[in-house]
């Protein structure tokens, strides 16, 4: 194996927990801007869905309105379950970026249909359409896994998307409640006998469409493809975004009238400026040099591109659903089931009137805390604020000190006692009940914000290859959607039966039993290193002896002495691990180029 001489070695980037200069901030920020559009749109309907069903006049029984409102909500979840695998596989075939953008467009279409819905069936179809056309939950997890491959960076990165969801889930309901029925709430601004009077719930949906269009534009211009093969394709949207950034920053990059490609003066372009670059795991266009195809530009045929060369050099697609992948998907489904069941049970428990029946301890008792709606809303708002804080700071701290799998198991061990103790809050003195409720809510959110990102990291690292990561995350998203659809339904039935029989603990203890099952199952799970790193290491032998022509500008296969020095000393090229005995670095005069510098996305 070839080792660089000591005098050519430069201090390499460390990827430890204290080195955050290489953290892919820009791409995660762009991804977060795309992500926040969805919870805003999804959660905006909840403040007015009851009044929307009431306006449809489908029933005269007020008690059944909640049932029909639940049907509208569940139609999205079941549709999302049925389409999750499809979108995951589609992202493996055409790339992550197109699927993410199509998901945002599909959500926008469903919001328009929902705003114009004249009856309950149309509203349900609109929500189902949103679930069918949007598979972004699994694809987003895949994209994060491919952007962040340094293990020390994963806890921080995987806490960002849940934080963004929490933020959007606060903005969405506030916006939906404020903009619904504008002719009634803002008669000075919205006149009667207008479109907003005929469709009183159209305005919040139109605003959501504007937000989603913003997400589409941001994604099209600035989001990079992360698929291991599709990222080498030419991306006109990203080129346009880079051109806009360059124009705004006063760069010399310009777009000519005759050529739509971005042209850079070759004498001024610094291809090997590695003064402050990320570690080898991050190959992003925001910091890496633009690479030319492996072949001479002049020798390329119309169908010859980097993506095709990479496909030819890589082995076939490995089996996606290995034993560890299946274990992780099952764990994700179990976690989603009992977590969403708690979210449904706790407001019902808090609002249920106190029972005057005689208690037969330790198991036979009913009733709730009888809290007013305003108090419950404030408690849940406090829970949401704490959730955002815990996502960003608590989860990375805990995982960094205890490890992902160990943390996940500890959380699952603590969770069942919480479920089993919550119904006993009715037995506490009234003066202690409020504090106990806050303690239960904070405990649940603490476990929640640690468990879900942990499963995402474990699942991403268990994937045998990034080429099947989309299918794996699609299956996980479908499993979670099914669990979130079945959980509230089954738990609601158990809670009703428990109140009728006098045992209100039935639903809570059933959730605890499901969690215990997940705890036992977690001991068959194993923690793996990020697969993208091991793939690179495994391919080092196959790349040995191949001329590293793609590291130089188009039409130039050999390096100048200055380029030799920078190439060998760069942190970007892992020549420590390569046999480059066949690498020819003989200095020759560069061949004249008739074409401008060609860019190939890295």
From Swiss-Prot:
Cellular component, GO annotation: membrane
Membrane topology: Multi-pass membrane protein
Record-annotated membrane-spanning stretches: 29-49, 67-87, 98-118, 128-148, 160-180, 201-221, 329-349, 378-398, 411-431, 439-459, 468-486, 505-525
Gene3D superfamilies: MFS general substrate transporter like domains
Chain segments carrying region Disordered: 527-602
Gene Ontology molecular function terms on file: transmembrane transporter activity
Keywords: Membrane, Transmembrane, Transmembrane helix, Transport
Family membership: Belongs to the major facilitator superfamily.
Function according to Swiss-Prot or TrEMBL: Major facilitator superfamily transporter that may be involved in A.fumigatus adaptation to azoles such as vorizonazole.
Protein name: Major facilitator superfamily multidrug transporter mfsB
Upper classification of the organism: Eukaryota, Fungi, Dikarya, Ascomycota, Pezizomycotina
């Amino acid at each position: 194996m070839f080792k660089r001489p000591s005098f050519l070695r430069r201090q390499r980037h460390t990827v430890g927990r204290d080195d955050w200069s290489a953290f892919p901030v820009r791409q995660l920020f762009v991804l977060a801007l795309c992500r926040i559009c969805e919870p805003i749109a999804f959660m905006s309907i909840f403040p007015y869905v009851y009044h929307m069903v009431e306006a449809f006049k489908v029933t005269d029984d007020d008690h059944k309105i909640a049932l029909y409102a639940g049907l509208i909500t569940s139609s999205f979840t079941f549709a999302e379950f049925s389409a999750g695998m499809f979108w995951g596989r589609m992202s493996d075939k055409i790339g992550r970026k197109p699927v993410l953008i199509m998901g945002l467009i599909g959500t926008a279409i469903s919001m328009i249909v929902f705003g114009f819905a004249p009856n309950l069936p149309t509203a349900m179809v609109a929500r189902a359409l949103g679930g069918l056309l949007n598979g972004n939950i699994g694809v987003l997890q895949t994209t994060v896994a491919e952007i962040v491959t340094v293990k020390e960076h994963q806890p921080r990165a995987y806490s960002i998307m849940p934080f963004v969801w929490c933020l959007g889930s606060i903005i969405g309901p506030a916006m939906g409640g404020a903009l619904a029925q504008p002719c009634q709430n803002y008669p000075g601004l919205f006149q009667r006998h207008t479109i907003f009077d005929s469709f009183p719930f159209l305005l919040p949906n139109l605003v959501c469409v504007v937000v989603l269009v913003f997400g589409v534009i941001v994604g099209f211009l600035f989001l990079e493809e992360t698929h291991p093969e599709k990222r080498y394709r030419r991306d006109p949207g990203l080129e346009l975004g880079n051109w806009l950034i360059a124009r705004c920053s006063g760069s010399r990059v310009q777009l000519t009238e005759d050529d739509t490609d971005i042209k850079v003066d070759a004498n001024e372009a610094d291809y090997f400026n590695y003064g402050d670059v990320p570690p080898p795991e991050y190959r992003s266009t925001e910091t890496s040099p633009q690479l030319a195809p492996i072949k001479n530009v002049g020798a390329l045929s119309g169908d010859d591109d980097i993506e095709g060369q990479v496909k030819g050099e890589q082995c076939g697609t490995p089996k996606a659903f290995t034993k560890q992948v299946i274990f992780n998907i099952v764990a994700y489904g179990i976690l989603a089931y009992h977590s969403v069941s708690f979210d449904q049970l706790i407001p019902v428990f808090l609002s249920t009137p106190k029972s005057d029946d005689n208690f037969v301890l330790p198991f036979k008792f009913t009733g709730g805390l009888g809290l007013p709606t305003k108090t419950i809303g404030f408690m849940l708002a406090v829970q949401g604020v704490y959730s955002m804080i815990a996502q960003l700071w608590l989860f990375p701290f805990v995982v960094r000190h205890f490890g992902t799998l160990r943390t996940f198991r500890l959380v699952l061990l603590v969770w069942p006692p919480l479920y089993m103790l919550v119904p006993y809050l009715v037995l506490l003195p009234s003066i202690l009940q409020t504090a106990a409720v806050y303690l239960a809510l904070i405990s649940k959110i603490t476990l929640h914000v640690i468990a879900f990102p942990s499963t995402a990291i474990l699942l991403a690292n268990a994937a045998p290859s990034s080429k099947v990561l989309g299918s794996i995350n699609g299956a996980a998203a479908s499993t979670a959607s099914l669990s979130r659809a079945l959980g509230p339904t089954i738990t609601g039935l158990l809670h009703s039966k428990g109140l009728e029989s006098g045992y209100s603990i039935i639903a809570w203890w059933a959730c605890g039993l499901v969690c215990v099952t997940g705890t036992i199952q977690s001991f068959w799970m194993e923690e793996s290193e990020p697969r993208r790193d091991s793939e690179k290491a495994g391919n080092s032998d196959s790349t040995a002896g191949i001329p590293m022509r793609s590291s130089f500008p188009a039409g130039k296969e050999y390096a100048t002495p200055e380029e030799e020095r920078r190439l060998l000393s760069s942190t970007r090229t892992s020549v420590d691990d390569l046999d480059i005995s066949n690498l020819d670095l003989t200095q020759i005069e560069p061949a004249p180029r008739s074409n401008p510098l060609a860019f190939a996305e890295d």
